[in-house]
C-alpha cells in the first residue's frame, strides 16, 4: 500500500517504452557467437544468467567486418610480426642470436671455420695443382698461409685476452689481495689487448712467412721486396696505433677504477652490508612466521610482487562470483601451485650450487635475493619493514629494542644484532619505532638506487671522456701512420704541428672547458645522483651528471636546471646528503625589556619539547639560545640553535620537523610570555588613554548644563535616572481629600565612590529636585524602602530636615542651603573614601550647591568644632534654628519628576525621634535594630 504522505504520488510521470519490465535482456533473446573464437559470456550461460552474453560480439562480426584484426606482437622487439621492414629480426638474425648463446669454443669455431676453409682452398690448390703460381714474388700457398695465420690469430689472441684477467687474478691474488681489482681493468681492456696481440702476431709472422719461407730459401730469394717493406711499415704503424689505443683505454679505466674506488667503494660496501643485515632479519622473521602465513599474507604478497600470490582468492564480502569465473580461478590456482613448485625447484638447485661454489646462485628464495628485489620499490620496502618490526616486537610494546633482536637471532649472533640495531636506530635513542624502521629501510633502498644511478651516470661521463680521448688518439694515430708510411717524417710533423697551432685558437675555450669539467667531475666530484644540494642559496636535487654539464631539479618549484660543470667549478656547493646530523639556527626578535630569566624559561620550554617522547627521535636534547644582537637599542635578537638527528636530504621530513618546531617555539614564547619589540610603547599608550581625567566633572559638561547648575537648585533641567525605583514617596492632592499619589522615584541613592557623607536635596517652590543633590547614601544597611510623607503644614521656606540615624553615621538637622563638608570630619572604618575626582568636582561647585558635611554622633562635637555661622542660603532660618526646634523639623521625602507639578501639593512630615527615649543608645541607631520596646516607643512618637 503506498504511503499517503508520500510527496511523489501525484507527480505526473511520462511513460517510456521498453522491451521489458526490468530493463534486462529477456532469456529468449539470442545473441550470435563471435566467429573469431573470442570469449563470449553468453555462450557459457545462455539460459542461467540474467545478463549473460551482453559483452559478446555484435551481429556484424559474423560478416567479417566492424572490428580491428588481431596482430601478433613480438615479445622481444615489441613490433608486429607481419612488418619485417620495421626492424624485425629476420631468420639470419635469429640464427646469429642463437649462435651468440653458444659456448665460447663452439662460437669461435663457428666464426673461424667458414673463412678458414675458404682460405685453405688457395693453399691446397697452390700446393697441388699450381705450384708455380706466385703473388708479388711469393708463392701462392705461403701467401695465403700468412693470411690464414692472420685470421686465426685474431681469435686466438681474443681467447688469450679473455684468459689473462683470470690468470692475473690467480697469480697476483696470492701475493696481495688488493691487486685483484686490477683484474677488472684487464677484463675491460680485452679488445685493446686483443688488437695489440694481433698486430704483434701479424708483424712478427709477416717477414718469416713471406720472405723466409722454405721455398724461397731453396730458391735463394730471401731479399725483401719494396712492397713487403711497405706492408711491414704499415703493420708497424698499426701496432703503434694499437698501443696508443691501449694506452688511452688503460687511462680511462684507471680513472674509472680509481674514481669508483674513491667515490663509490665505501658506499657500495655499506649498501651491500646493509642488505645482508636486512636479509638476516628477514630470514629470522621467516623462521618465526613462515611466508604467506595469515599474519603476514598481504605483506609477503607485496614483497614477492607476484600478482598470482597477491590478494585472496574469494571476492569481496557479500559478493558471490558467477560460475564463469571458476575456470579463471582454477587457472590462477594452477599457476600459483606451478609458481611455488618452480620456486622450490629453483631453490633446490640453488642449494646444490651453494654447496658446490659456496655462493648463492640463482636461488630466488634466498633472503638476500628477496630483500634485494623488495628494496627496488617503495611499497615492497615498507611491507618488508613492517614484517620485520611486527615479528620482532613483543606484544604490548610500541618499539623494538636491542634485546628483542638478540633474543630472536639467538646466541652467538650478538655482534650481528648490535650491527642491525645500529643500522636501524638512526636517531640513537635506544629504541626503534615502526615509522623509524620504515624510514630506515626505505632510505637504504633509495640509497641503493641512487648509487646505481650515480655509477651509471658516471660511467656515461667516463664514456664521453673515452670518446673524446679516443678522438685525440685517432688524430695522433693518423700522424703516426703517415710518419711510418711516408719518407719525409719531419715535413709531416711540421705540417701537422702548424695545423694544430692554427686550430688551437678555435678550440681553446672548448679544451679549457673539457679540462675543467674533467677536473670537476673526476677529481672534485661534489655530488652524486639524488643528492640534495644548495647552489647560490637555492635548493636542488641532482638528476643527471654528464662530462660537460649537470642537470638539477629545483626543490621549490620542480624546475629543471642545467648548469655547465665549468660554472659549477667556480661556485660554493652545499651537499646535504653527504652531511651528518645537521644544526639549524633561528633568529627571533623580542622586546628590549626581556630579562635573562625569561630567556632561560624559554630555553627550558624548548628543551622540554625536544626531549618529549614524540620528538626525541627527531631532535637532540640540547638547545642553544643566545642574544646575538640588540638592533638599534630597541629590540633583542635571540638565536635559537636546534640540533637535528639527521640531515636534510629528504625535504618532506625536514619540512615536517621544522614546522613542528616552529609551532612549539611560538607556543613557548606565548607561554613565558615574551613580548614583541615595541610592545612596551603600545602598553604605555594604552595606559595613557585609560588614565582618569583630573578635570572637574562640571567642566566637561556642555555649556547649557553648566548654566543650569550655576543657577542653583531652582532650575533643574535633567532628572537623574540613576536612583533606584524601589523608594517610595506619597503626594496628597489638596483638591481631592484622601487622595494619595505613590511615585516610584527615590531621593536616596548611593554615590559611586563618595561615601564620606550623604546629602539631602532641597525642596524648591517648584517641587522639583536638582540632579546633583538627588543622591543620598544609606551606609551598610541599604535601606531604600523607608516611607517619607510630605504634608502642607509647613511652607517650603520654613521647612526643616530630620536627621536620621544610619549605622555609624548620625545625620543631624542641617541647613539645606550650605551643603558643604566640614573639615576634620573623617569617614568610619566601614566606609570607603571618596574618589579624588568626586572630591574635586564637589569642591568646584558653588557654595550653595555643596553637599552637607557628615555628622558626628554627638551634637556637642559639632557645636565645638563648627561655630554658629550665618547661612549663605537665601532662606531666613539659620543653622542653630534647626537644632533648637527639632520637633518642628520634619524631613520631607524627595519626589520624582513623574508626578504632576501643576497640582497643589501637601507634604506629610514624620516627627523627629525623641532622643530621651533612646537613652543608653547611640543616636545613630537604626530603627530596624531597636528592641521591641524601643520600636513601640518610636512608633508611638512618630505617629
Curated annotation (Swiss-Prot):
Coiled coil: none annotated. Keywords: Calcium, Calcium channel, Calcium transport, Cell membrane, Ion channel, Ion transport, Membrane, Translocase, Transmembrane, Transmembrane helix, Transport. Residues 678-687, 744-759, 857-880 have a biased composition (Low complexity). Residues 14-37, 760-781, 827-842, 886-904 have a biased composition (Polar residues). Its main location: membrane. It is a multi-pass membrane protein. Residues 1-107, 176-195, 260-468, 524-943 are cytoplasmic. One of its GO terms (molecular function) is calcium ion binding. The chain crosses the membrane at residues 108-130, 150-175, 196-214, 234-259, 469-489, 503-523. Residues 412-447 form the EF-hand domain. EF-hand domain is involved in the detection of calcium concentration. This is Mechanosensitive ion channel protein BA. The lineage of its organism: Eukaryota, Fungi, Dikarya, Ascomycota, Pezizomycotina.
Amino acid at each position: 500500500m503506498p504511503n499517503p504522505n508520500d510527496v511523489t504520488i501525484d507527480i505526473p510521470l511520462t511513460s517510456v517504452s521498453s522491451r521489458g519490465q526490468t530493463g534486462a535482456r529477456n532469456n529468449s533473446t539470442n545473441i550470435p557467437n563471435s566467429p573469431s573464437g573470442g570469449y563470449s559470456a553468453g555462450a557459457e550461460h545462455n539460459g542461467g544468467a540474467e545478463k549473460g552474453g551482453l559483452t559478446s560480439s555484435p551481429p556484424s562480426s559474423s560478416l567479417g567486418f566492424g572490428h580491428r584484426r588481431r596482430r601478433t606482437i613480438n615479445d622481444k622487439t615489441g613490433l608486429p610480426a607481419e612488418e619485417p621492414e620495421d626492424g624485425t629480426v629476420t631468420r639470419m638474425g635469429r640464427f646469429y642470436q642463437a649462435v651468440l648463446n653458444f659456448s665460447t669454443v663452439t662460437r669461435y669455431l663457428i666464426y673461424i671455420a667458414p673463412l678458414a676453409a675458404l682460405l685453405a682452398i688457395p693453399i691446397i690448390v697452390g700446393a697441388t695443382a699450381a705450384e708455380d703460381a706466385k703473388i708479388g714474388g711469393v708463392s701462392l700457398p705461403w701467401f695465403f698461409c700468412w693470411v690464414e695465420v692472420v685470421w686465426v690469430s685474431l681469435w686466438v689472441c681474443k681467447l688469450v685476452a679473455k684468459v689473462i684477467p683470470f690468470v692475473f687474478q690467480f697469480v697476483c691474488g696470492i701475493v696481495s689481495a688488493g691487486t685483484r681489482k686490477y683484474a677488472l681493468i684487464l677484463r675491460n681492456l680485452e679488445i685493446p689487448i686483443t688488437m695489440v696481440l694481433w698486430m704483434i702476431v701479424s708483424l712478427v709472422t709477416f717477414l718469416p712467412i713471406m720472405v723466409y719461407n722454405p721455398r724461397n730459401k731453396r730458391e735463394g730469394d730471401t731479399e725483401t721486396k719494396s712492397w713487403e717493406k711497405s706492408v711491414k711499415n704499415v703493420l708497424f704503424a698499426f701496432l703503434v696505433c694499437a698501443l696508443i689505443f691501449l694506452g688511452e683505454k688503460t687511462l680511462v679505466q684507471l680513472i674509472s677504477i680509481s674514481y669508483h674506488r674513491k667515490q663509490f667503494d665505501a658506499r657500495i660496501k655499506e649498501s651491500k652490508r646493509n642488505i645482508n643485515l636486512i636479509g638476516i632479519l628477514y630470514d629470522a622473521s621467516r623462521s618465526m612466521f613462515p611466508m604467506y602465513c595469515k599474519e603476514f599474507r598481504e605483506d609477503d604478497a607485496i614483497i614477492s610482487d607476484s600478482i598470482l600470490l597477491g590478494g585472496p582468492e574469494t571476492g569481496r564480502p557479500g559478493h558471490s562470483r558467477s560460475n564463469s569465473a571458476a575456470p579463471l580461478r582454477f587457472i590462477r590456482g594452477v599457476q600459483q601451485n606451478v609458481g611455488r613448485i618452480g620456486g622450490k625447484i629453483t631453490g633446490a638447485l640453488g642449494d646444490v650450487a651453494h654447496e658446490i661454489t659456496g655462493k648463492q646462485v640463482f636461488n630466488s628464495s634466498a633472503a638476500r635475493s628477496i630483500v634485494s628485489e623488495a628494496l627496488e620499490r617503495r611499497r615492497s620496502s615498507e611491507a618488508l619493514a613492517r614484517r620485520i618490526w611486527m615479528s620482532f616486537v613483543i606484544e604490548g610494546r610500541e618499539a623494538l629494542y636491542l634485546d628483542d633482536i638478540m633474543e630472536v637471532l639467538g646466541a652467538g649472533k650478538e655482534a650481528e644484532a648490535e650491527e642491525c640495531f645500529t643500522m636501524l636506530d638512526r636517531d640513537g635513542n635506544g629504541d626503534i619505532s615502526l615509522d623509524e624502521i620504515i624510514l630506515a629501510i626505505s632510505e637504504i633502498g633509495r640509497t641503493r638506487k641512487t648509487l646505481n644511478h650515480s655509477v651509471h651516470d658516471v660511467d656515461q661521463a667516463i664514456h664521453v671522456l673515452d670518446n673524446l680521448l679516443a678522438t685525440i688518439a685517432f688524430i695522433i694515430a693518423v700522424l703516426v701512420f703517415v710518419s711510418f708510411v711516408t719518407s719525409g717524417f719531419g715535413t709531416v710533423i711540421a705540417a701537422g704541428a702548424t695545423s694544430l697551432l692554427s686550430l688551437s685558437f678555435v678550440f681553446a675555450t672548448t679544451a679549457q672547458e673539457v679540462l675543467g669539467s674533467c677536473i670537476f667531475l673526476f677529481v672534485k666530484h661534489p655530488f652524486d645522483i639524488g643528492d640534495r644540494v644548495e647552489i647560490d642559496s637555492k635548493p636542488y636535487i641532482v638528476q643527471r651528471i654528464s662530462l660537460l654539464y649537470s642537470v638539477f631539479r629545483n626543490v621549490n618549484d620542480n624546475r629543471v636546471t642545467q648548469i655547465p660543470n665549468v660554472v659549477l667549478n667556480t661556485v660554493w656547493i652545499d651537499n646535504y646528503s653527504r652531511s651528518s646530523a645537521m644544526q639549524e639556527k633561528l633568529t627571533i626578535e623580542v622586546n628590549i625589556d626581556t630579562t635573562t630569566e625569561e630567556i632561560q624559561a624559554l630555553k627550558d620550554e624548548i628543551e622540554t619539547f625536544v626531549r618529549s617522547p614524540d620528538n626525541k627521535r627527531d631532535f637532540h636534547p640540547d638547545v642553544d639560545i643566545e642574544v646575538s644582537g640588540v638592533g638599534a637599542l630597541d629590540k633583542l635578537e635571540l638565536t635559537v640553535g636546534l640540533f637535528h638527528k639527521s640531515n636534510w636530504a629528504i625535504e618532506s621530513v625536514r619540512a615536517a620537523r621544522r614546522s613542528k618546531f616552529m609551532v612549539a617555539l611560538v607556543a613557548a614564547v606565548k607561554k613565558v610570555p615574551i613580548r614583541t619589540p615595541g610592545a612596551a610603547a603600545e602598553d604605555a599608550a594604552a595606559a595613557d588613554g585609560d588614565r582618569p581625567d583630573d578635570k572637574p566633572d562640571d567642566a566637561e559638561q556642555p555649556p547649557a548644563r553648566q548654566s543650569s547648575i550655576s543657577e542653583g537648585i531652582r532650575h533643574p533641567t535633567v532628572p537623574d535616572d540613576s536612583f533606584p525605583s524601589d523608594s517610595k514617596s506619597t503626594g496628597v492632592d489638596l483638591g481631592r481629600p484622601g487622595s494619595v499619589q505613590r511615585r516610584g522615584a527615590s531621593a536616596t541613592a548611593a554615590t559611586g565612590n563618595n561615601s564620606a557623607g550623604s546629602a539631602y536635596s532641597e525642596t524648591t517652590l517648584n517641587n522639583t529636585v536638582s540632579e546633583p543633590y538627588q543622591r543620598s547614601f544609606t551606609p551598610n544597611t541599604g535601606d531604600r524602602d523607608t516611607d517619607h510623607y510630605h504634608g502642607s503644614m509647613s511652607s517650603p521656606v520654613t521647612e526643616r530636615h530630620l536627621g536620621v540615624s544610619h549605622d555609624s553615621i548620625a545625620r543631624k538637622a542641617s541647613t539645606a542651603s550650605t551643603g558643604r563638608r566640614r573639615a576634620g570630619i573623617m569617614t568610619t572604618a566601614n566606609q570607603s573614601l571618596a574618589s579624588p575626582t568626586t572630591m574635586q568636582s564637589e569642591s568646584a561647585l558653588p557654595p550653595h550647591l555643596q553637599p552637607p558635611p557628615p555628622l558626628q554622633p554627638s551634637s556637642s562635637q559639632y557645636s565645638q568644632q563648627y561655630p554658629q555661622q550665618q547661612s549663605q542660603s537665601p532662606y531666613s532660618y539659620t543653622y542653630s534654628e534647626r537644632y533648637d526646634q527639632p520637633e518642628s523639623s520634619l524631613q520631607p521625602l524627595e519626589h520624582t519628576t513623574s508626578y504632576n507639578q501643576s497640582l497643589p501639593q501637601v507634604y506629610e512630615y514624620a516627627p523627629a525621634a525623641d532622643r530621651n527615649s533612646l537613652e543608653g543608645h547611640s543616636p545613630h541607631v537604626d530603627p530596624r535594630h531597636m528592641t521591641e520596646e524601643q520600636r513601640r516607643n518610636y512608633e508611638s512618637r512618630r505617629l
